[in-house]
Amino acid sequence: MTHSPIQYRLIKKEKHTGARLGEIITPHGVFPTPMFMPVGTQATVKTQSPEELKEMKAGIILANTYHLWLRPGDDLVARAGGLHKFMNWDQPILTDSGGFQVYSLAEKRNITEEGVTFKNHLNGARMFLTPEKAISIQNNLGSDIMMSFDECPQFYQPYDYVKASIERTSRWAERGLKAHRRPQDQGLFGIVQGAGFEDLRRQSTADLVSMDFPGYSIGGLAVGESHEEMNAVLDFTTPLLPENKPRYLMGVGAPDSLIDGVIRGVDMFDCVLPTRIARNGTCMTSRGRLVVKNAQYAEDFTPLDHDCDCYTCQNYTRAYIRHLIKADETFGLRLTSYHNLYFLLNLMEKIRQAIMDDNILEFREDFIEKYGYGRSERNF
């Protein structure tokens, strides 16, 4: 393989766990790890400007291959000079392969060795996505980090189905590597699958590591399994991945899952969670989730989170934000989205410091106790 445009630099290992502090070097800059990546599905992180994302120290964002292929089209993005120019973002971008959306959004899917035929969710047109096409789209988009086309089987699928699926995903990964036109300035990651089966995760990992990708993703989690089941898969999967390459846990954004993923050696995470729940008036705070649109906050003139120094918490009250959301004002969604993204990015900063201080287990215990996992919303 040619020299990879994506390099991982290990800075420090935490003494008591698998957590590691590092940085990832890309053609559009360097970002620290562990890192949470805000999701910009349609080439925008919903309601946020690039300047606001930089303000909250989002070192890298994610864009969605499936959605951008359907609209506005990857050829148009290429003519615009690639995603970075198209959306005015000069820092790293990661694109997914489109596979997860094909399996979760599209109708009437038919999976064969060649690829996946489906009806697109916008207009019902018949579409055909292959490993080569997924790579071609991402080459046009021009992201720094690309994903191989994979199948994401449901966590509780039968063993024989998952075995056939991971073997096909490995063949697809090899086809994607061969189709990659820009290995000099775009790094392609392989995606480990295998549901909850340890031997299949091992087989999938061995297949992909033998292909020498610049980085590896752990897929097929956060799809309905329990928190304990996710941790168990990470316990036996992450140690199999090369120490000198980035490790990316796909689709995970709950605070406890971020901390537990880091403890098990994961470097990168993404999820739509912070912006999706923000649009329903749900805010993550140091004391747990707060549903600001609830009536109890109508005359609450305090910030969303007393321990947060984000723009929203420094300038606006729960009562005002509740009013905006009840009145269907976009500014309310902007304020809650900003806060939730800031909360997770700030959490990752604290996690990085805990790795430096070799006390991530104590940090986890303190965070979980304050956040109040297992209790319903209370007054605070």
Swiss-Prot record:
Pathway: tRNA modification; tRNA-queuosine biosynthesis. GO terms for molecular function: metal ion binding; tRNA-guanosine(34) queuine transglycosylase activity. Its cofactor is Zn(2+). Residues 251-257, 275-279 are annotated as: RNA binding. Its EC number is 2.4.2.29. It holds the Pfam family TGT. The keyword tRNA processing applies. Substrate binds at D96, S97, G98, G99, F100, D150, Q193, G220. The active site is at D96 (proton acceptor), D270 (nucleophile). HAMAP family: Q_tRNA_Tgt. Belongs to the queuine tRNA-ribosyltransferase family. Catalyzes the base-exchange of a guanine (G) residue with the queuine precursor 7-aminomethyl-7-deazaguanine (PreQ1) at position 34 (anticodon wobble position) in tRNAs with GU(N) anticodons (tRNA-Asp, -Asn, -His and -Tyr). Catalysis occurs through a double-displacement mechanism. The nucleophile active site attacks the C1' of nucleotide 34 to detach the guanine base from the RNA, forming a covalent enzyme-RNA intermediate. The proton acceptor active site deprotonates the incoming PreQ1, allowing a nucleophilic attack on the C1' of the ribose to form the product. This is Queuine tRNA-ribosyltransferase. It comes from Streptococcus mutans serotype c (strain ATCC 700610 / UA159).
